[in-house]
């Protein structure tokens, strides 16, 4: 196994992911996962979920770069990218990841603002008289 590449997306965030055989190190934007996410334990668990489900957390190294969005969206994009890369590495892992929805791109994005409204749906206050 050389380097396996995949991209993950969520909202406006994009994660480019490379998997290599290794000891389980996760590097994001040149920092370790703990440095990158600081005290956000829930986000760290979310990123590690595909590796934990496939029991690969000790056998592959993850190198990733993320662009756009916030930390939560970037973490979800990273999770999606890792899942896709694991499937590219071994197609048998698809049956483990698919039931958990890790291979599905979350299509929810911000609804656009409409004219005549304050936000996407918030209308100006209505006065009867």
Curated annotation (Swiss-Prot):
This is Small ribosomal subunit protein uS9. InterPro entries: Ribosomal_Su5_D2-typ_SF, Ribosomal_uS9, Ribosomal_uS9_bac/plastid, Ribosomal_uS9_CS, Ribsml_uS5_D2-typ_fold_subgr. Signal peptide: none annotated. It holds the Pfam family Ribosomal_S9. It comes from the Bacteria. PANTHER family: RIBOSOMAL PROTEIN S9 (PTHR21569), SMALL RIBOSOMAL SUBUNIT PROTEIN US9M (PTHR21569:SF1). One of its GO terms (molecular function) is structural constituent of ribosome. Keywords: Ribonucleoprotein, Ribosomal protein. Belongs to the universal ribosomal protein uS9 family. One of its GO terms (biological process) is translation. One of its GO terms (cellular component) is cytosolic small ribosomal subunit. HAMAP family: Ribosomal_uS9_B (MF_00532_B). Disulfide bonds: none annotated. It comes from Nitratiruptor sp. (strain SB155-2).
